Regions:
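Asp-based phosphoryl-transfer active-site loop
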Residues: 67-81, 273
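Short regulatory "switch" loops immediately downstream of catalytic or recognition motifs
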Residues: 1-2, 52-55, 276
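A metal-dependent, Asp-based hydrolase signature
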Residues: 83, 88-167, 171
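C-terminal cap/substrate-recognition subdomain and adjoining C-terminal extension
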Residues: 29-37, 41-47, 51, 66, ...
Length: 343
């Protein structure tokens, strides 16, 4: 009797179980990998590119070993206004550097920084900022530098959002990074920022290991401590300026393959996108336009937006994007939410 009662149940399970197994993948496929993006041309372009380069029957199929995507950092992956995060770090290190080198106290631009005049600091020239960076990012071992940056990031907060800088990553771009990796792409940060600085937190914040960070790089010197242990000291010598034409040069030097997709947000990314999209088969170039003063900042001067020295997006760059088929991402229209903590 027991066996007879069980047979109908077993028969039912034999029918239902295959249906369940069939529907589970279907539900998974229907999950939106880019939920923080509004439906629109930018989101569709990402899906189309990934589909064309990863489906084996596609004429534009790219083997996994060749799948490279590069991402600028400042203004593309996280907030860059009102001042680049690394520059803020360097400015806050000036008093300590001057303490060790008192002769810098009355010398510009260190004198201006010590005075704490924000308006005057904002007007510092690129040459003056480079002098500050050279003084504050050298003269210590690589290990000491990494420890210093970690310590600073643990307490430093953005003046507007009152949150750690590492929390101010753009959720839509974090989703793109994960989506690309889920489809066999190796993701790289290619930044004008300091390579050693970004490598400290890139794996934790972006899921990108330090060896996949290409940035502006300074020299190091090999030596030994008093116990004979070898170490590297950071020196004020520029090896690679990873801005403008330096980006494709850095990509060739450090990666060795032309990317199939590149993301940026400013004139400093133009050559990287040119280099990427000049290749054969499907290519994707995307630029983030900061046009959302309510949730973040609005700056260009493309499309009549306010001009800026930080993350400049000119009308000429906008015109080139349209000419070359690059997709301009409107922060205001294309991103449903900006940060992971947004409701």
């Amino acid at each position: 009797m027991t066996m007879l009662k069980l047979r109908p149940r077993l028969s039912t399970l034999s029918v239902v179980l295959p249906l369940l197994l069939w529907t589970v993948p279907t539900f998974a496929q229907q999950t939106d990998p880019l939920p923080s993006w509004n439906d629109g041309a930018a989101k569709k372009a990402i899906f189309k590119f990934v589909r064309e380069t990863t489906e084996k029957d596609s004429p534009k199929f790219v083997p996994v070993r060749q799948r490279i995507a590069t991402f600028d950092q400042d203004g593309t992956l996280w907030v860059e206004h009102p001042m680049y995060t690394q520059v803020v770090y360097c400015l806050e290190r000036v008093p300590r550097v001057v303490k060790d080198k008192p002769e810098l106290k009355d010398k510009e631009p260190f004198k201006t920084v010590l005075a704490g005049d924000r308006e005057a600091i904002a007007k510092l020239s690129l040459k003056e900022l480079e002098e500050i960076l050279a003084a504050t990012l050298s003269g210590m071992s690589v290990d000491e530098f990494q420890a210093e940056v970690n310590k600073w990031l643990a307490t430093a907060k953005h003046p507007r959002y009152k949150r750690p800088y590492t929390e101010l990553t753009y959720q839509p771009m974090i989703e793109v990074l994960k989506y690309f990796r889920a489809n066999g792409y190796k993701t790289y940060v290619v930044t004008g920022g300091g390579q050693d600085f970004v490598r400290v937190y890139s794996e934790k914040v972006y899921g990108i290991p330090p060896e996949q960070v290409v940035g502006t790089a300074g020299g190091t010197k090999y030596g030994y401590d008093k116990d004979g242990k070898p170490f590297l000291t950071k020196e004020p010598k520029l090896l690679l300026n990873d801005n403008n034409a330096g980006k494709p040069e850095g990509i060739h030097l450090m990666i060795g393959r032309r990317p199939f997709a590149s993301f940026g947000n400013s004139t400093g990314d133009r050559q990287m996108l040119e280099y990427t999209t000049a290749g054969e088969r499907a290519r994707l170039g995307m630029l983030v336009l900061h046009d959302d003063s309510k949730r973040e900042y609005a700056y260009g001067p493309a499309k009549g937006l306010p001009d800026t020295k930080v993350g400049t997006f000119t009308e000429a760059l906008y015109d080139e994007a349209k000419k070359r088929g690059w997709v301009v991402i409107s922060m205001k229209d294309d991103w449903k939410r900006l940060f992971s903590f947004d409701k």
